[in-house]
Amino acid sequence: MCRAIAVALIVYLAQHYILAHAEVIASGRLEKCVVDGVTEELDCQEKVVVTLTVGNGQSLQTEALEFSLSCLNSPDGRCPCSCSAADPTCACRDLAAPLRVSLTKSPLWASYPLQYLSSFNWKPLEVILRPSNKVCKDGDWEDSPTCGWFSQGGVRVADSQGFCCECSSSQVWDDTFGSSKERTRANLDCDFWSDPLDILIGRKPVSAHCLTFDPQWYSGYELGAASLQFEIAITVEVPTAPSPTTATTSATPRTNNSSSANSTNSTNSPAPQFLSPPAPSTREVLHLGPSVPLASSASRLLSAKLLGDLAMYTQLPAISNQVLMVPQPPAAAAATGSPLDATLATNRSAWMLLDKTMLSMDGLACDKVGTGFSAFRYQPSGCGRAPQACLSGQLKDLWEADLARIADGRVPLYMITRFTGGSDTTLQSFSGGPLSFALPVTSHSQSLVTLSVAADGVRLVTNRSPGKITGAAVCRFAGTSCGGFEAVAARGYIYVNITNTGRLDSDYTLTVSNCSSNVRPIEARTLAVRAGSAASLDPPMELYVEDQAAAAARTCTVSLYDSVGAVTDSLTLSFYTNATQLVVKPSGGYNGTGDGAGVKRNGTDCSTACTNPIDVLCFVTKKCWSKFGRLLGIIGGALVGLGLLAVALKFGWLASLAASCCGGGGGAAAGGAGGGMGLGTGGGGGCFGGGQQQQQLPPAASHAMSPPQQQQRSHAEVAAGAAVAGAGAAGAAAAVLGAKHGGGGGGARGKQQHADTRHLQDRDSRAIDGGASIGSSSAGGSSSLSSYSQPREAGGRLLQPPAAAVFVPEGGGGGAAGDEGARAQSSDWDARGRSPRVADEHGSPRQRYDGVRQSPYMVSANPYDGWYDGGSGGGGGGGGGGYGREAPPPQGPPPHPVGAPPPPPRRRSLWERMWLQRPGGGGGGGGGGGGGGGGGSGGGVDQHGGRSCADAARRGGGGPGGMRGVEGLMSNGGRPNGPHPHAPPPPPPPQQQQQQQRQRRSFLESLTAMMTLPWGGGREEEAGGDRRGGGRGGAAAAHGGRGAGGGRGHPPSIGSPPPGPLQPPEYGPQGGQARRWGAGGGRGGVGGDGGGGGVGAAAYVQLSTGGRGGGGGGGRGRGGGREGPTWHNPVYDWQAPPK
């Protein structure tokens, strides 16, 4: 029953007392029982339970609840008291006045907890220095940089030394010629003429940029979640005087302005109610709040409980996780002991509230609060920016921006006074600590409180007093100006003053309604005003409009309601709004629409559009730059390769590696001389060719030789005390590949005859059994390392090997001499008509080697060339062909003084070195039968020379070998068909020549020489000579070339002086001049031996021991001497000076 009454009362009060500040939600009598668990008896009491609301604007005791009590402490629970008050043992007392309870509520605050983050400077500044000595130091390891170091706890702060800027070369150029449009951070004068001397020596204008701090610092505190803070005070007044015995009501009623609501029901018409007369009483105040929601009076007559708050109309500001900036006390105040709390508590208007995105907690970001040394030092393009760049957006900048907004009538963005309308007094009224932060809550907030009182009944008494609106205005933030504001960009603040014109403290409700269009509704506010006093809204009401238009007159009605909801005063409030001032848009720049983004090309488009890899026009038109670049790369690579090839040829790197075939045939008693090293001539007449075996002379003839003759012979021999047969000359061109050599002489098939009886021998096709070989010519070809370490004389020059000579392997054996009267049959030729395979049993042809293409079978110019019998002059066992460059024959003897030392060497020209060597001529033909005819010389580069030699030998006379071959001699010592038949022989050179200066190899040449494998031997050629091959072995000896033993085709008669040199002692590999060598060899017998092969050169031009000649005797030659290498070093190629 009681619950039903309470619900009906709540509905009634909600409909009729919605504007009341302390509204009773429910009230009724209720028997409350308590069980303590000690006993099963219930402690029950009948109480009046009242649930009411308390608003946040109810700060004065303008309402009171009066609980009627007949007596107190009645022993039997009945009133009036059954005992007498005069009885000292009677505790029951009848009350003269009701129990009075009033409730008030403090202002409501939204409090935010604080958490310290860091300290932030008020305004970091840049200091610019211009060192007088134009030296700026900003290194990380500088002890004394120009800006100095900051320290923190005795440790240097990284990057606190600032940075330096100087004029660049381009800035000096631009400033000098007046075309500079760029700035420098310190506005440096980069003109060259400002200080030309210093700029010339590299001391350009320079500036140092240092970071310093303002003395004022702020502490940053992060805001936590908001909580509501308020306090409800319950004042309980208990009367102490007993009630009078007379009537409870006075005969003369007193009326007042208070209203009363009685919770007791009566069937009779309500009697007039009067305010209870004041009576002596005791006062007790109970406090309720979110922290302590329960309280009871000392007499246990009343208990109170805070149930909670109803929802507000306006939410709290969403500023959690923002940072509150609180100024720190100055250092002077801290040093004097000024308390921080007092400083902060009296300076809350300087507090600022910032979002975290505006801060740099680590100091690495520019233009943010907290910018540090690293951000300042490493700012992008620091030297090209304006001074103080990277230092904007600091606390001072934000504060000044807020002041500018306030001056324009706008609300600040960072000051915390934006929540109070610019009033600082509201912030100071918060009762929290000095580092507490709370914002006032102006929205309606109703707290539910339940009171339980042991009373018979209750009534609510509310003060009602008239009020008046004394003033109202719409102003801008902080009241800078009134009358209106800027629409949307700002908001208006309604300031209202009211006065309580009654005699009681009363509550009032202020509303703003009936506004013009597009004015946002405004929430009502409540005030408690003392009797006869005036009050103002603090903070003021906020007024928003919802358009950007300018309006001269907008209106709203301001009404004042009293405590019971009656309008006690109202007025019309007029204001204006200005149009919103939008940010000015930038103008200028490009006014067109542009061409838009292009279509991206990929590799697939180019591959389908340009299929020709060399279609340059397609590449350019289709913009296939990758393919165009690829083509340019290929062409460029080829050109670079050709350039490197030219350089290699110029310096002899490639030419010294180019293989050439210089036969190593043997110059033996019966065969032609060995092939040379390929500097120009053919085998028998090869330059530096194989040695020609010396003819053993009778003792008388030997003793009859004059000293010049013996000295002439000694030029070709260096081995002490040894009659060296077939001594070969080392190749003149210094090949970096190491030793390449020809073959030595092969074994004899017939016995060699004496020179005096050689012409008596029959010229048949059988082999003549002869005697032993002459001298040391019986063994195969060989070479010795010791011979390389000795100076050798060749061509009138004294050569000296380098200190570290490359070992030259032993020379190969030369081929055996051919028989008399033998001729090649048609079956000896292969199916393709090529010459018979050379080296029947002894030689091993090589398929090919680098630099020279050579087939296993040499091709003769005439496929039917063969051997001739001894009578006709069979082909001698000539050496392999040279590998040289064709040159025209000389026209006359060279004008060189007789007996003079050879001219100094010179390098060949680039054109000469770039021209690849061509194959040299064939080997020399064999001598005529019976020794009657002189042997032909080795062939030159043309094929005619070798053949003519063979033909001449068959006819019994020698013939010229070729352009550069030494002529063979006829039996009478003549030189048929020679280049200079009438040239007088020059005297022999002196025995001692001045040693040429040694030329050391480069590292590349030495490395190549050590790492290159030796080349294999070559192969013979037929008697006709041809380009590379040597001739076949013949019956008679021939002068097969210019070996060390080269000379006459047959020895002179005993006692006759030896012939002189055939040509002047000049060396000209490109001029085709004959070279001068030692004394001529003896004539070979019928069916003589194969000649010993000449050895190849080492790394430099030097002589070496030639291959040894074979044994004497006739018989068909089984194989010629092996070919020597064709390498030569064009860098060290000697050539006669230009004529």
From Swiss-Prot:
InterPro entries in alphabetical order: HAP2/GCS1, HAP2/GCS1_dom
Keyword Acyltransferase: no
Alphabetically ordered keywords of this record: Cell membrane, Cell projection, Cytoplasmic vesicle, Disulfide bond, Fertilization, Glycoprotein, Lipid-binding, Membrane, Signal, Transmembrane, Transmembrane helix
Compartments where found: Cell membrane; Cell projection; Cytoplasmic vesicle membrane
Cytoplasmic-side segments: 652-1139
GO molecular function, one term: lipid binding
Biased composition (Gly residues): 868-884, 919-943, 955-965, 1040-1049, 1078-1096, 1106-1118
Membrane topology, as annotated: Single-pass type I membrane protein
Effect of Q394P: Abolishes expression at the cell surface. Abolishes ability to mediate gamete fusion
Positions in the Extracellular compartment: 23-630
Basic and acidic residues compositional bias, start-end: 753-767, 829-851, 1018-1029
Disruption phenotype: No effect on normal adhesion of male (minus) gametes and female (plus) gametes, but the gametes fail to fuse and to give rise to quadriflagellated zygotes.
One family name in Pfam for this protein: HAP2-GCS1
GO biological process, one term: protein insertion into membrane
Note in the entry: HAP2/GCS1 family members mediate membrane fusion between gametes in a broad range of eukaryotes, ranging from algae and higher plants to protozoans and cnidaria, suggesting they are derived from an ancestral gamete fusogen. They function similar to viral fusogens, by inserting part of their extracellular domain into the lipid bilayer of an adjoining cell.
Assembly and interaction partners: Monomer. Homotrimer. Membrane contact and insertion (via its extracellular domain) into a lipid membrane probably triggers trimerization.
Family classification: Belongs to the HAP2/GCS1 family.
Protein name: Hapless 2
Native species: Chlamydomonas reinhardtii
Gene encoding the protein: HAP2
